[in-house]
């Protein structure tokens, strides 16, 4: 399995999008970041809950979130409740300096501990040449350095391999899936350590739609007047509100 980020969107709107592929290249998940952060809102639209799901891959159940979605505990819990085994995280990198890398590390290690899953996190990296092309202002250039924390975290919250904090590269590691059971035996946030009768999550995972198409009226709906109905039919219609609907249809037709 593998994940990547991109910008995608049909019909004019763009969305910050994550793609999850299986080992054979099959696209298993296309999800949109549910809330663009700060200045991102000038470019990207809001995603829906349809992408808040874990999918089965050749290497295990995989879920994904982007950047500050990890600061939304309900979004993280939605994936935890679906028993994700590998969590794909992505942050921009080359931003704000070392403090951003520290924040990323805290965030992904905490999610690994809380969910009892592996976290595979990737961050971007800008070269000096790329930074110079982005801005001629030296002060702005400083804001485009550091902030890189590409890492693989175990369910126990530790680095499986040393993190990549500068430059381009790829981290490769063997994942001992038995560590998931070991962690959840002690603390399972969506199992024996959960209290659903006290605290629970309500997720609307329907794809967003800007139009709902109503079912058409039957061909003979409203063709008969109330006077043609017998007393029993009129009483039944009044009881269930159907008479009001017929009057509304007839008035609309008269116009």
Task: Give the ranges of each region predicted by the language model.
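C-terminal beta-strand edge segments of enzyme domains
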Residues: 123-255
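Short, compositionally biased segments
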Residues: 1-8, 226-229
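CN hydrolase (nitrilase-like) catalytic-core segments centered on the catalytic cysteine
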Residues: 1, 61, 67-171
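Active-site catalytic loop in hydrolytic enzyme cores
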Residues: 7-89, 94-110, 149, 186
């Amino acid at each position: 399995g593998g994940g990547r980020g991109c910008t995608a969107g049909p019909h004019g709107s763009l969305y910050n999008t994550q793609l999850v592929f299986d080992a054979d290249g099959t696209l298993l998940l296309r999800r949109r970041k549910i809330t663009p952060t700060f200045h991102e809102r000038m470019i990207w639209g809001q995603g829906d809950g349809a992408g808040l799901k874990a999918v089965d891959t050749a290497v295990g159940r995989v879920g994904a979130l982007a950047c500050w979605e990890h600061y939304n505990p309900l979004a993280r819990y939605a994936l935890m409740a679906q028993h994700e085994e590998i969590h794909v995280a992505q942050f921009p990198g080359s931003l704000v300096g070392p403090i951003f890398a520290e924040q990323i590390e805290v965030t992904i290690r905490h999610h690994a501990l809380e969910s009892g899953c592996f976290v595979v996190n990737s961050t971007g990296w800008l070269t000096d040449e790329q930074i110079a092309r982005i801005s001629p202002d030296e002060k702005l250039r400083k804001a485009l350095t550091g902030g890189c924390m590409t890492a693989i975290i175990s369910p126990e919250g530790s680095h499986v391999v040393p993190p990549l904090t500068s430059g381009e590269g790829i981290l490769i590691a063997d994942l001992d899936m038995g560590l998931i059971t070991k962690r959840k035996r002690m603390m399972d946030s969506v199992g024996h350590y959960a209290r659903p009768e006290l605290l629970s999550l309500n997720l609307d995972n329907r794809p967003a739609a800007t139009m709902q198409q109503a079912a058409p009226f039957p061909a003979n709906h409203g063709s008969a007047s109330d006077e043609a109905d017998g007393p029993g039919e009129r009483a039944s219609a009044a009881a269930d509100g159907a008479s009001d609907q017929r009057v509304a249809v007839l008035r609309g037709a008269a116009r």
